[in-house]
Amino acid sequence: MPAAPKIPFPLSTAPGGNPIEGAGRLINCSAEPIADGRSVRHRQPGLTTFAVTGQTGYRGSLLVNNALFVAFNGRLVKVDAAGVVSDIGALAGTKKVEMARNNLVPTCQVAIVTENGAFLTDASGAAPVAWPDADLPFPNSVCFQDGYFFFGIGDRRVFATGINSSSVDPLCFTTAESKSQDALIRVVAHKGLLFVFTTAGCEVWSDTANPAPGFPYSRLAVLDRGLIAPTALAGWEEGFGNLLWVGDDCGVYRLGAGLQPDKVSPPDLDRLLQKQAKIDPT
């Protein structure tokens, strides 16, 4: 009886442009090279249930001290370390949110940006309210660094609050001006720098302690690759070291040496992202 043919399992996702070209995809497992050119594949068991909120439509979350603040369709809830769920209050909207916290003592503030504007709550779980300072224009993203909340505005402006405060000086802003026909879609704090992503590039700003009411940061570098969608970004969170994002050309990039974007995606993955971008560009 002839021996069964060996099945060549892939080492990464390689579906090919057409099924006949593909080498396969790894789903719920990962490949690891070992000695003598061999490799081993480990099963990835997935996740276990930690808490049940009774809500639907996950929109985003943020760890605040020892509790997880989670936004769902129309609501904001808090999950403590024991998995106990508490309702915080209404948070209108269904789209993804951006959240950040500051270091205000004794109770830090939490900023939330939704499709309906900016909202403010705090670590105690106070019901979210519309941003209390009317000098803040309508933002599309928020992050925190060096004591400041930074808010990104679609017209390429970035506003900074006071130190560990919700106050906004109408003069404390800067504008991403390296490109002329792009739109700002995300601000991210990473490794002591502020990354201002637009649809056509990215500006990197550093803290130069510019005096008030001026913007406290100054531009350090400009990256050639923009961001395809506000949520197409990872690695900036605490516990991660490398910034990864899907660029405006549907390629995946990693922040490399000299603040330059290094492309890390193979052509197969680029094609998958291009197809997805046609279906849902967000």
Can you describe what each PLM-predicted range is?
Residues 79-112:
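A broadly used, surface-exposed interaction patch
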Residues 1-85, 138-199, 203-210:
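N-terminal beta-propeller domains
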Residues 83-87, 125-129, 165-172, 210-218, ...:
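Beta-strand initiation motifs
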Residues 44, 50-52, 90-94, 127-136:
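Short linear interaction motifs
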Residues 185-282:
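Beta-sheet-dominated scaffold domains
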Residues 100-132, 151:
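Hydrophobic or amphipathic alpha-helical targeting/insertion segments
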Residues 54-62, 92-105, 134-146, 182-186, ...:
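Repeated scaffold domains used in trafficking and secretory/extracellular systems
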Residues 75, 117-119, 201, 251:
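A short loop-to-beta-strand structural motif that recurs across blades of beta-propeller domains
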